[in-house]
Design a protein with these regions (language model features):
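N-terminal non-catalytic accessory region
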Residues: 2-195, 199-261, 268-270, 276-279, ...
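Glycine-rich, aromatic-lined ligand/substrate-binding cores of catalytic
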Residues: 264-347
Length: 412
């Protein structure tokens, strides 16, 4: 059977060669493949490597490293996330907000860099040692390479400092435009397919809003988003209040919190008004409710008004939910318990709230991962969706249906 179908397949190729190329010689060649659209991966929150170099005036514990000659990887280096050492790590990874310049900087004596610009390797694997937990765009990347893509030529990566919000990432959008044009030139002027995860989706929305229609028609084939946090997530409210343990890495949310709440990206990712109504309750206490339009009061009462300052810096990006005007494929998951709100049993916001759950992928609420469909009828380019049920926000990157969908779109 197998032989028969193989022969039949060969025959079709042979005949089509003769028909297509009647003047050519009768040599059996493989049918010309459709040209591959080069890929640029755009990672999400936590999806890029971060290296630091230290020359610190002081450290939080005596055993913390004070100075290093070279840059070393801190994200996602699981050794540095061990108990005790995590305090050293937090001080090296966290940002400090300046409410006058409206920008963040590292702790004194910490220099950072995001390695691997243009390369796919550092977004295929977040952990340079390629530990299993650090697998990121690996499954999609391997599938593409198996089908003819070449790392660093037709498959690129656009990592960024995910700790920051778009208000501080202006240079990233400029660099992404350059990388797009360079990749287009490197690949016989084939338009680009962008593949984004999580926060990468709204980052690309902003990027495309900034480009002219002519530029997009020339350089952009499509965007594919996986678990896109298009319109933020209620989980960001939870992280500001309690921190997050990053799933099953054996970490404590409370230990991760000081680093996490210092990130303007977390304030950017608070629920967007595109899919949250102003009077929707996000946090409740016996005394009062905090609605979407009262998040600023929540952060004041939480004793962390900086969160709202960082949000204000990014409001113009959050509030402009205009269509990107490119072909979109939104791949997402549902039916995983996803935080929708917090309910405190006491009026003390330092107590532990009960989490209210709704539908989503465990991190991003369904209404946000589906928000791409709000642009149907508002842009002429098509918007397709794939819902894979019961797959977690990071696991979905390795989901067979997702990988096959991308394969069908890109290769077959
Ligand atoms: C800025 O920060 C300083 C010091 O933390 C604080 O005293 C001041 O009230 C803040 N200003 C604004 C506008 O938030
Ligand atoms: C990727 O390409 C760039 C520029 O073409 C080059 O500088 C870099 O070393 C390459 N990286 C790898 C891993 O080949
Ligand atoms: C908070 O909102 C809920 C509806 O979401 C309402 O039933 C409740 O009475 C409100 N609580 C307070 C204290 O206003």
């Amino acid at each position: 059977m197998r032989t028969a179908s193989f022969l039949c397949f060969t025959f079709i190729i042979f005949v089509s060669q003769i028909v297509d190329n009647s003047e050519a010689s009768f040599i059996i060649r493989r049918a010309p493949k459709k040209p591959l659209s080069p890929v640029i991966f755009v990672p999400g929150d936590g999806g890029s490597q971060v290296d630091v170099k230290l020359n610190k005036p002081s450290t939080v514990h005596i055993f913390c490293t004070k100075a290093t000659k070279e840059y070393f990887n801190i994200w996602l280096n699981l050794e540095l996330l061990a108990p005790l050492i995590i305090d050293c790590w937090t001080d090296n990874a966290k940002l400090h907000y300046d409410n006058v310049t409206r920008t963040t900087s590292n702790s004194p004596g910490v220099e950072h860099r995001i390695p691997g610009w243009g390369d796919s390797e550092t977004v295929e694997w977040i952990d340079p040692s390629h530990a299993k937990q650090g697998a990121y765009f690996k499954s999609v990347g391997n599938m593409l390479v198996d089908n003819g893509y070449v790392r660093n030529v037709s498959m690129r990566g656009a990592p960024f400092d995910f700790r920051k919000g778009p208000s501080e990432l202006g240079q990233y959008f400029i660099d992404l435009k350059k990388l797009t044009e360079e990749t287009y030139d490197l690949n016989d002027h084939e338009p680009i397919t962008y593949i984004a995860h999580s926060m990468g989706a709204p980052m690309l929305m902003i990027f495309f809003q900034q480009q002219t229609e002519a530029w997009k028609e020339k350089y952009v084939k499509r965007m594919i988003t996986i678990a896109g946090a298009w319109a933020g997530s209620a989980k960001a409210v939870k992280v500001f209040a309690m921190g997050d343990d990053l799933g099953s890495l054996g970490l404590f949310a409370s230990e991760m919190k000081p680093m996490q709440i210092s990130m303007p990206s977390l304030a950017f990712l608070l629920p967007f008004p595109a899919v949250w109504k102003p009077d929707e309750v996000l946090v409740s206490t016996p005394r009062r409710n905090y609605t979407h339009s009262q998040l600023n009061e929540f952060f004041t009462d939480l004793g962390y008004p900086i969160a709202w300052e960082m949000r204000k810096d990014n409001l113009k990006f959050v509030e402009n939910f205009a269509p990107p005007n490119v072909e979109i494929h939104c791949l997402y998951s549902t039916k995983m318990k996803t935080v929708e709100g917090l309910r405190y049993k006491s009026n003390d916001l330092s107590s532990t709230p009960e989490l209210i759950y709704g539908d989503g992928d465990g991190s991003v609420n369904l209404r946000s991962s589906q928000a791409c469909t709000l642009w149907r009828g508002l842009q002429k380019q098509s918007i397709s969706t794939l819902n894979v049920e019961k797959v977690e926000h990071f696991e979905i990157l390795h989901n067979e249906k997702v990988v096959n969908y991308i394969k069908d779109l890109m290769i077959n």
